[in-house]
From Swiss-Prot:
Protein name per the record: Holliday junction branch migration complex subunit RuvB
Main function: The RuvA-RuvB-RuvC complex processes Holliday junction (HJ) DNA during genetic recombination and DNA repair, while the RuvA-RuvB complex plays an important role in the rescue of blocked DNA replication forks via replication fork reversal (RFR). RuvA specifically binds to HJ cruciform DNA, conferring on it an open structure. The RuvB hexamer acts as an ATP-dependent pump, pulling dsDNA into and through the RuvAB complex. RuvB forms 2 homohexamers on either side of HJ DNA bound by 1 or 2 RuvA tetramers; 4 subunits per hexamer contact DNA at a time.
Stored InterPro entries: AAA+_ATPase, AAA_lid_4, DNA_helicase_Holl-junc_RuvB, P-loop_NTPase, RuvB-like_N, RuvB_C, WH-like_DNA-bd_sf, WH_DNA-bd_sf
Annotated positions binding Mg(2+): 90
Subcellular localization: Cytoplasm
């Protein structure tokens, strides 16, 4: 299997909403750092479906799809994967390519700004190849419309010329598989979403699954870790394998500086406390969000923009990076009137609902 990344995917995406400051990636960010993209993640990715830990139901469905496609000597049906970042959407795509013995071309929707960007990728596909488009909900209208006949009829319709002299030329494409990844499945248009034969959601991982992932990664990195140490890291990883692997590397740093030889529960706990990752996997920004809501808005309900303005954090970052996990563990509730801090969050912060905090 060859992995090819679109050259355009390295072009910085335009994001007018981002501002410098606290919304820079943190230790618990589910999005990969540049270094992780280039080296670490590639090294520790599994290459077979049976080696992929977690997502049991999804694995069963994909195994059936692959077996059926191989029996028919056909390509896989188009697949849409959705869920929070860091759960393995790219890894699954690479595994499918490896298992099917085809190439996987990787790109992201923000890189496909012009029709020629997607056209160049499509016409270079070989039979059975997989085209993986990350953040597919961000495709522009022209690019999306080019994909409709490509997905449905394996045909690329190109307009040549302008005005009255314009004509449409159709180019035959080999049968291929489009895998789209998104954190916002509701943002996809119905015509695009309806062209996927399989639509599957990735869920957050359980602690026992993350423990196995940490143990596997530690073995690949030649790092000694006890099961208790792996569990301590897993417990603070926000249900996300990418974060678990990142925390393992930081705990390994701490162990080496302390001249340790093995990551046990005590050492892992000490290291993660230094990195301000608490027992529930919250970092200082999570706590800032909760404390701001309690201190300034009496626990809510409060709107997202008000939280962003009060914390100095970007609203999109709060919504996409921090809020999903706080909702998952029940620390936040979303109501028609806004976000509300739950009683469980008060308890975790050592407060009663009547108490208030001073912002640190």
């Amino acid at each position: 299997m060859a992995i090819k990344r679109s050259g355009n995917s390295d072009r910085p995406a335009k994001n007018p909403s981002s501002t410098p400051g606290t919304n820079a990636p943190t230790l618990l960010s589910p999005t990969p750092t540049h270094q992780e993209k280039e080296t670490s993640e590639e090294k520790i990715r599994p290459h077979r479906l049976e080696d992929y830990i977690g997502q049991k139901d999804l694995k069963s469905i994909l195994a059936i799809a692959m077996e059926a496609a191989k029996t028919r000597q056909d390509s896989l049906d188009h697949l849409l994967l959705y869920g929070p970042p860091g759960l393995g959407k790219t890894t699954i795509s690479l595994i499918l390519a490896s298992e099917m013995g085809v190439n996987c071309k990787i790109t992201a929707a923000p890189a496909l700004e012009r029709p020629r960007d997607i056209t160049g990728l499509l016409i270079n596909l070989k039979p059975g190849d997989i085209l993986f488009i990350d953040e597919i909900h961000r495709l522009n209208r022209l690019t999306e419309e080019l994909l409709y006949p490509a997905m449905e009829d394996y045909r690329l319709d190109i307009t040549i010329g302008k005005g009255k002299a314009a004509r449409t030329q159709s180019i035959h494409l080999p049968k291929f598989t489009l895998i789209g990844a998104t954190t916002k499945v509701g943002a996809l248009t119905s015509p695009l979403r309806d062209r996927f034969g399989l639509i599957q959601r990735l869920r957050f991982y359980e602690v026992d699954e993350l423990t196995l992932i940490v143990l596997r990664t530690a073995q690949i990195l030649d790092t000694a870790v006890t099961e208790e140490g792996a569990t301590e890291i897993a417990r603070r990883s926000r249900g996300t394998p990418r974060i678990a692997n990142r925390l393992l590397r930081r705990v390994r740093d701490y162990m080496q500086v302390k001249n340790g030889t093995t990551i046990d529960q005590e050492l892992a706990s000490e290291a993660l406390d230094i990195y301000q990752v608490d027992k529930q996997g919250l970092d200082w920004i999570d706590r800032l969000i909760l404390e701001t809501m309690i201190n300034q808005f009496k626990g809510g309900p409060v709107g997202l923009e008000a939280i962003a303005a009060s914390t100095g954090e970007d609203a999109k970052t709060i919504e996409e990076v921090y809020e999903p996990y706080l909702l998952q563990i029940g620390f936040l509730n979303r109501t028609p009137r806004g976000r509300v801090v739950s009683a469980v969050a008060y308890q975790h912060l050592g407060l009663t609902s009547e108490e208030q905090l001073s912002i640190f």
